[in-house]
Swiss-Prot record:
Pfam families: TBP
Species this chain originates from: Sulfolobus acidocaldarius (strain ATCC 33909 / DSM 639 / JCM 8929 / NBRC 15157 / NCIMB 11770)
Lineage: Archaea, Thermoproteota, Thermoprotei, Sulfolobales, Sulfolobaceae
Sequence repeat boundaries on the chain: 14-90, 105-181
PANTHER family: TATA-BOX BINDING PROTEIN
Protein's job: General factor that plays a role in the activation of archaeal genes transcribed by RNA polymerase. Binds specifically to the TATA box promoter element which lies close to the position of transcription initiation.
Protein name from the UniProt record: TATA-box-binding protein
Keywords: DNA-binding, Repeat, Transcription, Transcription regulation
Similarity-based family: Belongs to the TBP family.
Length: 197
């Protein structure tokens, strides 16, 4: 099959961004619990304070070391806005925060649909750095070197991408695996009757 016959129609969605935020100061979590509304802090159960935003639905775990783990953002912009909102809220309720927070993305989880049928048996045989045991798990696990991500690829053409540090890495990985699967003749177009509605 000529690669041009299968158009690239991938739809990619960022599902979750996990980031660490460094505040470069120690924090009094007991004072935060007493003054900031809608936070949870039970050091006997978990050493961090849990701060939830409703919209966007983002959770931050705040530790006395001044480190935060922020999860739930669907874009880098949403992540930055959420961190600013958390800092603003803490300051509003009397927390003395100095310096600028340093945000570092640790992991981006995304989903994608290539809108093709993937022959996983053939892909498992021809692709390097993969694991495919259909008796254990229906997806092929593919470790890509550049960008450094892990893709869970299903025969339906749907996939999960983990390990990216930037949103553009997700899009690059999806396009790269699509091109590779086409090159190896491991995909076929979805027939009209196979389309989901």
């Amino acid at each position: 099959m000529i690669p041009d016959e299968i158009p690239y129609k991938a739809v990619v969605n960022i599902e979750n961004i996990v980031a660490t935020v460094t505040l470069d100061q120690t924090l009094d979590l007991y004072a935060m619990e007493r003054s900031v509304p809608n936070v949870e802090y039970d050091p006997d159960q978990f050493p961090g304070l849990i701060f939830r935003l409703e919209s966007p639905k983002i959770t931050s775990l705040i530790f006395k070391s001044g480190k935060m783990v922020v999860t739930g953002a669907k874009s880098t912009d949403e992540l930055i806005k959420a961190v600013k909102r958390i800092i603003k809220t803490l300051k509003k309720y009397g927390m003395q925060l100095t310096g600028k927070p340093k945000i570092q993305i640790q992991n981006i989880v995304a989903s994608a649909n290539l809108h093709v049928i993937v022959n996983l048996d053939k892909a498992a045989f021809l692709l390097e750095n993969n694991m495919y045991e259909p008796e254990q798990f229906p997806g092929l696990i593919y470790r890509m070197d550049e960008p450094r991500v892990v893709l869970l690829i299903f025969s339906s053409g749907k996939m999960v991408i983990t390990g990216a540090k930037r949103e553009d890495e997700v899009h690059k990985a999806v396009k790269k695996i699509f091109d590779k699967l086409v090159e190896l003749d491991c995909v076929k177009p979805v027939e009209e009757e196979e389309l989901e509605f």
